[in-house]
């Protein structure tokens, strides 16, 4: 079964999306959380990769598993093992030919650059 999920994260504490040995990444944390509820090493594929410190509101991922459980159990289970700065927002079973990167119909990026002499209290990350 192939599962697609939407991931939201605050990336300031991570070295980007892509997993790397001995470095804290978003993908690495998600795959560790999936392992915690499945006891299987499951690889995830994302619609795109973000750099260190970058946040995401709706990064789409997919992964394959033979385990069957309600979709809300995937969401709650994975979230229970993730740091608070990473959240799975939803999960859906998708067709086997769905691909998070290649099936995307559009991508949206927003850049916020503060050009001021005083640091922002709410934009400090």
Which positions does each model-derived feature cover?
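Structured-RNA-binding interfaces characteristic of tRNA pseudouridine synthases
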Residues: 1-125
């Amino acid at each position: 079964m192939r599962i697609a999920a939407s991931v939201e994260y605050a990336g300031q504490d991570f070295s980007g999306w892509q997993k790397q040995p001995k470095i804290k990444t978003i993908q690495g944390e998600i795959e560790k959380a999936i392992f915690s509820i499945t006891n299987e090493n499951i690889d995830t594929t994302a619609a795109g990769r973000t750099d260190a410190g970058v946040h995401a509101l709706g990064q789409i991922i997919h992964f394959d598993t033979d385990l069957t459980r309600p979709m809300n159990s995937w969401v709650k289970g994975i979230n229970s093992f993730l740091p608070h700065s990473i959240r799975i927002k939803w999960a859906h079973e998708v067709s086997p030919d769905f691909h998070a990167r290649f099936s995307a119909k559009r991508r949206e990026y927003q850049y916020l650059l503060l050009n001021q002499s005083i640091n922002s209290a709410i934009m400090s990350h």
